[in-house]
């Protein structure tokens, strides 16, 4: 799934402390199979801030997002809402959409949105509202394998942003979208930031300019 594992419940649950920043990055060298890939300067991302990851192709932007999502090691000292990436409380605070987000084959697009909201104990209305803004209403009863890559991406983006979690990670979210959908996505990101959510986004274009993002440049190691 493009989203993190279900939020822990009961005695296993440790909610993110709203007083802690959504993301704390130390000075870091990203490595793949032990090979240095990129270096970056540390920063603290506060609620409501948008961070644009910048750098040439292959420098490690997607690798960094995977580290932040807890899918890949290499983030010594990184903290998500005060916790180590991949830990239960960090995953409970993070939504993540890669460039080609997989969806479960046994749920229609609409069922996936309802299932995701229920799994996270969140209202489904924000997910469905964003889906409508992205032009998905006619596709909600369709199986993912029958959807185009761009439409699947819209479903994943609707789920991730609709959950309204403290930290949202988006890898090239505009790449497969038409102009109207890009505008709707930008509006959703702007509203998420205005509500206190932090976003980390990779994009090769200038789509994020209206959000006045901070920029983190990854330099080849």
For the regions a protein language model found, what residue spans apply to each?
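Q-loop/switch helix immediately C-terminal to the Walker
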Residues: 100, 105-121
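Hydrophobic anchor residue at the start of the ABC signature
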Residues: 157
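Conserved ABC ATPase "signature" region
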Residues: 114, 124-140
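The feature captures the beta-strand-to-loop junction immediately N-terminal to the Walker
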Residues: 54-56
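Helix-to-loop junction immediately C-terminal to a conserved catalytic motif
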Residues: 69
């Amino acid at each position: 799934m493009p989203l993190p594992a279900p939020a822990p419940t009961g005695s296993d649950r440790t909610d993110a402390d709203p007083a802690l920043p959504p993301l704390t990055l130390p000075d870091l060298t990203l490595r793949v199979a032990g090979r240095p890939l990129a270096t970056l300067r540390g920063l603290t991302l506060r609620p409501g801030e948008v961070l644009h990851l910048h750098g040439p192709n292959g420098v490690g932007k997607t690798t960094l997002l995977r580290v932040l999502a807890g899918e890949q090691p290499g983030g010594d000292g990184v903290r998500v809402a005060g916790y180590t990436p991949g830990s239960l409380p960090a995953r409970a605070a993070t939504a993540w959409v890669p460039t080609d987000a997989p969806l479960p084959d046994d749920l229609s697009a609409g069922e996936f949105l309802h299932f995701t909201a229920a799994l996270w104990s969140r209202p489904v209305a924000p997910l469905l509202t964003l889906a409508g803004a992205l032009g998905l209403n006619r596709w909600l009863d369709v199986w993912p394998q029958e959807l185009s890559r761009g439409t699947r991406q819209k479903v994943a983006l609707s789920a991730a942003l609709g959950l309204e979690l403290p930290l949202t990670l988006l890898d090239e979210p505009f790449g497969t979208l038409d102009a109207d959908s890009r505008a709707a996505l930008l509006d959703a990101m702007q509203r998420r930031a205005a509500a206190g959510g932090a976003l980390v986004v990779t994009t090769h274009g200038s789509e994020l300019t209206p959000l006045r993002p901070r920029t983190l440049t990854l330099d080849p190691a």
